[in-house]
Amino acid sequence: MTKRTLEGTNRKRKRTSGFRARMRSATGRRVIKARRSKGRARLAV
């Protein structure tokens, strides 16, 4: 059996695409704004 090739790490995930990471940059804030206006249940990871 082949081993799993994608084993994500939560720290990396939060640091790159978490809410606070999004709020750090102008484009990230735009992402949050777009997701808010769309009515997403989850704004960030």
Swiss-Prot record:
PROSITE patterns xrefs: RIBOSOMAL_L34 (PS00784)
Biased composition range(s): Basic residues: 11-23
InterPro entries: Ribosomal_bL34, Ribosomal_bL34_CS
One of the protein's GO biological processes: translation
Keywords: Ribonucleoprotein, Ribosomal protein
GO cellular component: ribonucleoprotein complex; ribosome
UniProt GO molecular function: structural constituent of ribosome
Biased composition (Basic and acidic residues): 1-10
Chain positions covered by the region annotation Disordered: 1-27
Family stated for the protein in its record: Belongs to the bacterial ribosomal protein bL34 family.
The protein's name in its UniProt record: Large ribosomal subunit protein bL34
Lineage of the species this protein comes from: Bacteria, Bacillati, Cyanobacteriota, Cyanophyceae, Synechococcales
